[in-house]
Structure formats: structure tokens, C-alpha cells
Swiss-Prot record:
Pfam families: FBPase_2 (PF06874). Keywords: Carbohydrate metabolism, Hydrolase, Manganese. Belongs to the FBPase class 3 family. The gene is fbp. It comes from the Bacteria. This is Fructose-1,6-bisphosphatase class 3. GO terms for molecular function: fructose 1,6-bisphosphate 1-phosphatase activity. HAMAP family: FBPase_class3. It catalyses: beta-D-fructose 1,6-bisphosphate + H2O = beta-D-fructose 6-phosphate + phosphate. Its cofactor is Mn(2+). It is an enzyme of class 3 (hydrolase). Pathway: Carbohydrate biosynthesis; gluconeogenesis.
């Protein structure tokens, strides 16, 4: 038997399986017709968001309002028949149906009339938003309680009085039986869902913001989402895997921004051992360099500043000690220069870095032995073990991190776009930077794929195995390493920022990627590395805030790269001048939406105050893109090809039809 015979047998087995799904010519032909019809529909709308940094309120609002698209749809339909105030009220109802209905029920005198008018408007909006999708796709999105009725109303054609009466009777019955409120909620959520076909989160769900957990809970309920991991995401993923350096870093950042409610209340991590340790060793230390960044209007956080400052310093020193064991174990990480505790002159209170002597602003190190500065005290060893245990055994954190692994990756190719959070490692001349991992050299696409697989091993492999240990070390490297695609800098100057006042020592030099990202030829080279055609592809990423207020454009390299970190995080909004970007990719092309500051969910509901958004057309297609032009379209074309071959097999009698 030769290779051709083997291939023919495999092929026949495949078609016998396909024949079970389509057992005769009629069914196979019908499916071909259906798939061909789908190919000609407009492509679904994709939304891209990045660098949310735990700011759940603006994130949830942007999802609910479709980055301003919901209101534009209302205006398209009702601009000639509704006042602006009515449009705002209708939009708010769609964004927050439960809360808005509670207000309406208290204020509206003739609620049945209001229900009838509102239901008719919502059905019209829903019909408009769902018109580019197949009935099958819309049907799958319908809430089970109202699936049949909504489908009837969406696809009703008013060709006569009887049809209109039928439609009106359905609406009246919904109101009469007391289900109007639930029906409005169902329609509002369906509209939200129809606006966004696919959501891309390009990294950093976590960081300093208060509630990344709400963001992940929201994404877990979302109909279609993918995530490209950010450096802060990887740090939390490493902590959940039990990486001691990641645990210390997470707690350092959490104490720095007084964001301990997330750690203690939401994830149930016991911080009492850290507080007890910090009070013992830093009771009389003002810890001035470690005073957390708290809001003036947060009295609870301000009351705890002294304790949190001490916890902040304690975990920071512990972090510096813990990093040595990985750096020593993995010389290929090339991070020896970040070992600084042994470079301190503890008597003089100085340190020499790159030939320059700096005076330390703090020389109180009660847990450091100058003769062996990286050695953990017995209490430190017990402390880090307790903290790691809490992270590894937090059910909610583990559930969230498993979701990040299931929906996430280091990069994604999707509909000719290349998505990644940070960068592709390059040197200053634009050459690809490589890294030796387990005796083999990796760069570019292979490097990102290797980091992806090693991270999964760090989380999922058996405790104590070499695979898990190496993967755990890589997870920390991805947070801080010079060839990490999630970091993008030559060093992380954490020690210098805490202990040296001279800001020259704080400089973290970016890698070549950020110096050269305005060059079209560099973007073309990266796209080719990932198997994409530069003439029709682009890079979409975040990580570095775009300083729009200084005139910086998010559109780089003649449109080959779009950077969408616009400052969801309040801490960066002074730099960016805006409060975030959404990139929208629909059948007409690309639109970049910049968002103004979001006050609060409460104000959005009570005052019907929406986020002000400005839309910039990045790319306008003369010919509307269809499903055929997408990745799903390519898959459907393969299915059509196979089904056509199955028809031929039936007609030749190779496989018998079942009628």
C-alpha cells in the first residue's frame, strides 16, 4: 500500500463521517446554499479594548453602549421623530435596563402607554441591529424565555392590517400579563449583544484599578471574547500559579495603590501575616518612600496609610530577596545586573550603579544581613509560604486565572490583524532579538509561542516537576525580562524608584520596537514573520499610553500599527488627555473611538450622562467587507468545498445516500 492509498482511505473515512451529518444530496445541497448565503452577509463588528487596569465602571459602560454605537443607531432610526432628551433616555434604558426601569416605574403615571411605546422602539432598534446577521445566529442569541416571541417580532413583515394587529396583540399581551419589564430587559441586552460580534481585550485587565474581578466576571458571561495577556495579567497569573516573586510583586503594587480590598475581600487572601510582620520590623519607620498613592476622598484608605506603608516596604524588600533565586537558577535570563542588595554600602547608605554613587533615601533594612543580603530570615520564609498558600488556594482567583488561560494567549491573528499587548522584541537597529530557552534559540513568532506554552506549563503542570518550575520562572520573566514581549524595556528600575531620589537612575529605556514602530518597513517585517500579508494587515496593540494631548497619534507607520492604550486607567489620563480608545472594525472599515472621562455609573443612570466619544475613520472600504473576507469565511469555504465533494461522491455511488 503506497502513500496515495493511505490518503484515499483517510479521505473516505472523513467523508463517511460527514455523510452521517448530511446523509443525502438534498441535505448536503441545502447546507451549501445556506453557507454560500452566509458568505455574502456583512462581516460582524469587532471591538478592540486594551489596558483597562481594573477600571471596571468605564469598561462596563463602553461594553453596554457599544463605544457610542448604540446611541448612533437610535439617532439613525429616530433623529426625525424623537427629541434629544428622548434619545438619551432610550439609550440609558438600553445600557442599564434594570436600574432605569426602577426609576421609570416610580415616575411614570401611565406605565402601560410607556411600555407600549418603548417596546415598539426597542423592537425597531433590535431589528435594525440584527439585520446583518442570519436568523440562525440571532436565534442563538435570544433569551430562552422570550425566544419565540422576539423572533416573531423581529422578522414580522407588515403587508396588511391583519399582520399589524397580530404584532400589536403580542405587545399588548406582554403588558397585560405583567412581563413588560422582563421583556424590555431582554431586548436591551439583545441590542447590546448584536452591536458587538467579537470583543478583543488586548491585555492588562489587572493593575492598579479597584475591581479587575468585575471585568473578568463580565467577560466570562460575554458571548464572544479573546484576550491577549498583558504584563500585569501575567503577574497575577504567576501569583495564582504560586510563583513567589509574582506574589510579592502583586502585593507590592496592591499596597502601593492601597488596593487591598481586592486582595483581601474579593480574593480572600489573608494579609494578617504581612501586617504583623511589617509592624514588628518597621513600627518606628515612617516608610516615607512607601506611602501608598490614595485618593483624598477615600477616608478608609487614608486611615490605614501608616500600616499599609509598612506592609509596602516589607513586601518590597522581600521581593528583592526572592528574585535572586530565579536569577541564579536561570543565567539565560541575563538579569544579574538587577541584583542590587549586595551592591549597597550599608554603613554609608549608598549604592554604586553604572559607575555613579547614589545616596539612598532610606537606609533602614532590619531584615537584611549585609554579609548575606539575599538570605531570607526564618520569619520571611514562613511569611512568603503563607502568602503563596493563600494565592494558590483562592477559589475565585483560580477561576479567573483559568479563564485567562482558556480565552487568552500571547498573540492572536484574527481577520488579517495581528493582536498582541506589548511588543515584538527587537534591538535598536530593528533586528529580531532572540532568547535561548532550554538549549534552543527562539525569536519573533516562535518566541511568543514558546512563552505561551511555558506559561501554561507553569500553571498546569504537576507541582514539583521541572516543567512547572521552569514555566513558573518564565511567568516572572515575562513581567520583568528584557526580551519579554509583555514588558518592552531593558530593565525594570523598581529599586531605583524607591531608594534613589535622582530621577536619572529611574530611567527605563524602551527596546528597539518602540523606537522604530513608526517605520512602515518594520511593521511589514513583523507582519510577514507572523504569516500575514502587509498589504492588507495591521498590528493592533496597547501597553504604552498614547499622549494624545501632546499631539501623538495612535495610528503609526502609515496605518500599519494602531496603538489603543488611551488611558482607561485614571492614573494615565493626565498623560493621554483622554480616557481610553475603542477600535471598531466593521464591514465598512476601521474606526477609532476616543472616550472622554467617565464620571460614574450612578450619574449615567440618574442624569442620563453618557461618555462623550469622538470617532475617527481610520480606513474606509469602498466595497463592504463580507463574511467571505474573514477567517470564519475561509473556514466556511473549506466546508463548502468538502460538501461539494460529498455531492460528487454520492452521485458516483461511492457512498450511498440515506433518504
Amino acid at each position: 500500500m503506497n502513500n496515495n492509498d493511505v490518503e484515499d482511505i483517510k479521505k473516505l473515512k472523513y467523508f463517511r463521517l460527514l455523510a452521517k451529518q448530511y446523509p443525502n444530496i438534498a441535505l448536503a445541497a441545502t447546507e451549501i446554499i445556506n453557507l454560500e448565503a452566509i458568505l455574502n452577509l456583512p462581516k460582524g463588528t469587532e471591538h478592540f479594548l486594551s489596558d483597562i487596569h481594573g477600571e471596571y465602571e468605564p469598561f462596563v459602560h463602553v461594553l453596554r453602549n457599544g463605544s457610542g454605537v448604540v446611541k448612533r443607531k437610535i439617532e439613525d432610526l429616530f433623529c426625525k421623530s424623537l427629541l434629544e432628551s428622548d434619545i438619551k433616555s432610550l439609550a440609558t434604558l438600553i445600557y442599564y435596563p434594570e436600574q432605569k426601569l426602577d426609576i421609570v416605574l416610580k415616575e411614570e403615571r401611565n406605565i402601560d402607554d410607556w411600555y407600549k411605546i418603548t417596546l415598539n422602539r426597542l423592537i425597531e432598534i433590535c431589528r435594525f441591529c440584527s439585520s446583518k446577521y442570519t436568523r440562525s445566529k440571532v436565534r442563538k442569541a435570544l433569551p430562552a424565555d422570550f425566544a419565540y416571541i422576539i423572533e416573531e417580532l423581529l422578522h414580522e413583515q407588515f403587508n396588511g392590517i391583519d399582520k399589524e394587529e397580530y404584532y400589536d396583540r403580542i405587545i399588548t399581551t406582554i403588558i397585560d400579563i405583567g412581563r413588560a419589564k422582563e421583556f424590555i430587559i431582554a431586548l436591551s441586552k439583545l441590542i447590546q449583544r448584536m452591536i458587538i460580534d467579537r470583543l478583543h481585550i488586548i491585555g492588562d485587565i489587572y493593575d492598579r484599578g479597584p475591581r479587575p474581578d468585575i471585568i473578568i466576571d463580565t467577560l466570562m458571561e460575554y458571548h464572544s471574547v479573546d484576550i491577549q495577556w498583558g504584563n500585569h495579567d501575567m503577574l497575577w497569573m504567576g501569583a495564582a500559579a504560586g510563583v513567589r516573586t509574582c506574589v510579592a510583586n502583586v502585593l507590592r503594587i496592591s499596597t502601593r495603590y492601597a488596593n487591598l480590598d481586592l486582595v483581601e475581600e474579593i480574593y480572600g487572601i489573608n494579609l494578617l501575616p504581612l501586617a504583623t510582620f511589617a509592624l514588628k520590623y518597621y513600627r518606628d519607620d515612617p516608610c516615607e518612600s512607601f506611602i501608598p498613592k490614595v485618593k483624598e476622598d477615600d477616608p478608609a484608605a487614608n486611615q490605614e496609610v501608616d500600616l499599609v506603608s509598612k506592609m509596602h516596604k516589607a513586601i518590597t524588600i522581600l521581593q528583592f530577596k526572592l528574585e535572586k533565586e530565579i536569577i541564579d537558577r536561570r543565567p539565560e535570563f541575563e538579569l544579574e545586573e538587577r541584583l542590587l542588595l549586595d551592591k549597597i554600602d550599608y554603613e554609608k547608605g549608598t549604592i554604586i550603579l553604572n559607575g555613579t554613587e547614589y545616596k539612598l533615601n532610606d537606609n533602614n533594612f532590619p531584615t537584611i544581613d549585609p554579609k548575606d543580603p539575599y538570605k531570607l530570615t526564618e520569619e520571611e520564609s514562613v511569611l512568603i509560604d503563607k502568602l503563596v498558600y493563600s494565592f494558590v488556594n483562592s477559589d475565585k482567583l483560580q477561576k479567573h486565572v483559568r479563564f485567562l488561560f482558556s480565552k487568552g494567549n500571547m498573540y492572536l491573528k484574527f481577520n488579517s490583524n495581528l493582536l498582541f499587548h506589548g511588543c515584538i522584541p527587537l534591538d535598536d537597529d530593528g533586528n529580531l532579538k532572540s532568547m535561548w530557552i532550554q538549549g534552543e534559540e527562539y525569536e519573533s513568532k516562535r518566541l511568543l509561542e514558546k512563552f505561551d506554552s511555558l506559561s501554561r506549563e507553569g500553571y498546569f503542570e504537576k507541582v514539583g516537576s521541572e516543567e512547572k518550575t521552569y514555566g513558573m520562572d518564565i511567568m516572572w520573566y515575562l513581567w520583568t525580562g528584557p526580551v519579554s514581549p509583555l514588558f518592552g524595556k531593558k530593565k525594570m528600575a523598581t529599586f531605583e524608584r524607591y531608594f534613589i531620589d535622582d530621577e536619572i537612575a529611574h530611567i527605563e529605556q524602551k527596546t528597539g520596537y518602540y523606537k522604530l514602530r513608526d517605520r512602515e518597513e518594520m511593521c511589514d517585517m513583523i507582519l510577514r514573520e507572523f504569516g500575514l500579508d502587509p498589504s492588507e494587515s495591521r498590528i493592533i496593540n496597547g501597553h504604552v499610553p498614547v499622549k494624545k494631548k501632546n499631539g501623538e497619534s495612535p495610528i503609526k507607520a502609515n496605518g500599519k500599527m494602531i496603538v489603543i492604550d488611551g488611558g482607561f486607567s485614571k492614573a494615565y489620563q493626565k498623560q493621554t488627555g483622554i480616557a481610553g480608545y475603542t477600535l471598531i472594525y466593521n464591514s465598512y472599515g476601521l474606526q477609532l473611538v476616543s472616550h472622554e472621562h467617565f464620571s460614574s455609573t450612578e450619574e449615567s443612570i440618574m442624569k442620563e450622562k453618557d461618555i462623550l466619544s469622538t470617532t475617527l475613520v481610520v480606513e474606509q472600504k469602498l466595497k463592504r467587507k463580507t463574511v467571505e473576507d474573514t477567517d470564519i469565511g475561509k473556514e466556511l469555504q473549506v466546508q463548502i468545498k468538502d460538501l461539494k465533494e460529498l455531492l460528487l461522491i454520492y452521485r458516483k455511488g461511492i457512498i450511498k445516500e440515506i433518504r
